[in-house]
Regions:
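Flavin (FAD/FMN) cofactor-binding and adjacent substrate-gating region
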Residues: 99-180, 185-186, 192-199
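Dinucleotide-binding Rossmann-like beta1-alpha1 core, especially the glycine-rich loop
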Residues: 48-141, 268-270
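Active-site lid/adjacent beta-loop-alpha segment flanking the redox-cofactor pocket in flavoenzymes
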Residues: 236, 252-353
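Conserved beta-strand-loop-beta-strand element in the redox core of flavoprotein oxidoreductases
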Residues: 191-211, 216
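Central helical "cap/lid" subdomain
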Residues: 40, 209-258
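Flavin (FAD/FMN) cofactor-binding core of flavoprotein oxidoreductases
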Residues: 123-133, 241, 303-381, 385-405
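Glycine-rich FAD pyrophosphate-binding loop
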Residues: 23-44
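Beta1/beta-strand and adjacent pyrophosphate-binding region of the FAD-binding site
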Residues: 1-14, 31
């Protein structure tokens, strides 16, 4: 019978980050079990992988900072001489529209936390990002009809933000894990969890094979609730698989100049480039677009809805006036595991000895993943190393009270 010191269930960005952070600081025998045929085929593969610092809670700002630091030094962090992924330092532009005090307030707060930020006015936007319209009014969502814009904007810019390819990143982590002796097993589904005597003893796979372990980490994303049930763990948090829509289109030649990762709070969209700037990826920042619960994460509509596409295109046409309505627009859908209680993840040990969790990331998981991995690995091993975060795991403990927030959206 195969034995491991730790089993991580789920080979997305969270599971592999935990496994890698364990492997790089210990000699533990580690296995990652993934039911899909490739790593990152769940929430991670559909992620826009935007790496931004600004959050309303300071501890999450620090987690984002520490996660992004790993992405910005990816070869050093993974130990790979030629990693597939590399960080795109496009910066992150926040456009709050008519709330003219917001940018200065957030700039002061981020500066106090050690994050490099700037406040940009209309002239700055036009000079640095000529394709972007700094209008402070909301677009016409119904028809997309142009209006007479009002200017005088105050915008907030994260100098060191950007994005990284989510699939390449996950493949790199899997390679780093294997190089360190981690057994990354694909097409391997956990059928049941042995918790005799109130402690994890091992797991049984779909093919009937039994694996012994005293410690199992549930990093199964939208499939996490089934493992709670298998382990007999009562979950007080409302973790809901939620359909999230994204659209993309080719970038036309009319859009000149640099386009940063952008958060248009009036328009309810975020956007960034991809494929060396040749495409635009567009998603929602609205809480109302994070409400579609999915009963079965293996069965949900994976194409974006027509009305969603049109609403977001109206917003994009307003923010990027040179963007024509012509051209093919494509869409896809992925899943967040939304923690409806406070849109923050829950981590750590449960009432069943040896059953640990890392679930409910609510769309924040990618940028936080290296830091989350370090939190969990340090809590298990007691050892610290480079690229660790100083934020204690207790901040996101499964036993904590919900974090109080003004808005339960992906912006948090």
């Amino acid at each position: 019978m195969k034995k491991y010191d730790v089993i991580v269930v789920g080979a997305g960005i969270i599971g592999l980050s935990i496994a890698w952070q364990l492997a790089r600081r210990s000699a533990l025998r580690i296995a990652v079990l993934e039911k899909a045929s490739a790593v990152g085929e769940g929430s991670t593969g559909a992620s826009s992988a935007i790496c931004r610092f600004r959050y309303s809670i300071d501890e999450v700002v620090f987690l984002a900072r520490d996660g992004i630091n790993a992405y910005r030094h990816w070869s050093e962090f993974t130990g790979l001489k030629a990693p597939r992924a590399s960080f795109n330092s496009d910066g992150v532009l926040w456009m709050p529209g008519g709330d003219l005090a917001w940018a200065d307030r957030e700039h002061a707060r981020m500066q106090a936390l050690g994050i490099a930020t700037e406040v940009l006015d209309d002239a700055d936007i036009r000079a640095r990002f000529p394709a972007i319209n700094p209008c402070i009014l909301a677009p016409d969502f119904e028809t997309g009809e142009d209006h007479e814009c009002r200017f005088g904007s105050r915008n907030f810019f994260e100098v060191d933000g950007g994005y990284i390819d989510p699939v390449a990143t996950t493949e790199d982590l899997a390679e780093a894990c294997r190089n360190a002796g981690v057994d990354v097993r694909l097409k391997t589904r956990v059928a049941s969890v042995d918790t005799r005597g109130g402690a994890v003893r091992g797991v049984t796979l779909d093919d009937g094979v039994t694996i012994e372990t005293p410690l199992m980490i549930n990093a199964a994303g939208p499939w996490c609730r089934r493992l709670y049930e298998e382990a007999g763990v009562e979950l007080k948090w409302d973790l809901v698989p939620t359909r999230i829509q994204v659209i993309y289109r080719d970038r036309p030649a009319e859009l000149e100049g640099h386009i940063p990762v952008s958060v248009d709070m009036q328009g309810g969209v975020y956007f960034r480039t991809q494929n060396r700037g040749q495409q635009l990826v567009i998603g929602s920042v609205l809480e109302e677009d994070e409400k579609e619960a999915v009963a079965n994460p293996d069965e949900f509509r994976k194409e974006a809805d027509d009305d969603f596409q049109m609403l977001k295109l109206h917003a994009m046409h307003h923010r990027l006036p040179a963007l024509p309505y012509r051209g093919q627009v494509r869409g896809y859908c992925g899943l967040y595991t939304v923690n409806r209680d406070d849109v923050h993840p829950v981590l750590g040990p449960t009432a069943v000895d040896g059953f640990w969790v890392a679930n409910g990331f609510s769309g924040h998981g990618f940028k936080l993943a290296p830091a989350i991995g370090s939190m969990v690995a340090r809590a298990i091993t007691g050892d610290a190393t480079d690229f660790d975060t100083a934020v204690p795991m207790s901040f996101l403990s499964i036993d904590r009270e919900p974090i109080r927030l003004d808005s339960k959206s992906v912006l948090a």
